[in-house]
UniProtKB/Swiss-Prot annotation:
Signal peptide: 1-20
Compartment(s) where it occurs, according to its Swiss-Prot or TrEMBL record: Secreted
Name of the protein this chain belongs to: Cholecystokinin A
Source species: Xenopus laevis
Post-translational modification: The precursor is cleaved by proteases to produce a number of active cholecystokinins.
Length: 123
């Protein structure tokens, strides 16, 4: 329930920010767009002092955020009655009761569960 509310708030913030960016883009004139696109963009280099070109990845970031949200929502729908979901499918969840197939075989002596009737006395 709490995670659903957080997701809704996150989606609302993302949609509001994208609407704000769209309205700002509508205000900028075509001439300003041409001058901005002709200027080179530079990002700060590590410590070498060299300039390197900066590429905008706003569209990529938006699509990546969308993909992450879709995966989260799909996993939250698959969540069991406990409300837990698996972030990484190959990570085991240790609180689920399951048999250990490689170590649970006939003849295995589990002293904590054996009853007195099953124990054979040699007399």
């Amino acid at each position: 329930m709490y995670s659903g509310i957080c997701i809704c708030l996150l989606l609302a913030m993302l949609s509001a920010s994208s609407k704000a960016h769209q309205s700002e883009d509508a205000v900028v004139t075509e001439m300003d767009q041409l001058t901005l696109s002709q200027l080179p963009r530079y990002a700060r280099a590590s410590s070498a002092g060299q300039k390197k070109s900066f590429q905008r990845t706003d569209g990529d970031q938006r699509s990546n955020i969308g993909n992450v949200l879709v995966k989260y929502l799909q996993q939250s729908r698959k969540a069991g009655p406990s409300g837990r979901y698996v972030v990484l499918p190959n990570r085991p969840i240790f609180d689920q009761p399951h048999r250990i197939n490689d170590r649970d075989y006939m003849g295995w002596m589990d002293f904590g569960r054996r009853s007195a009737e099953e124990y054979e006395y040699s007399s």
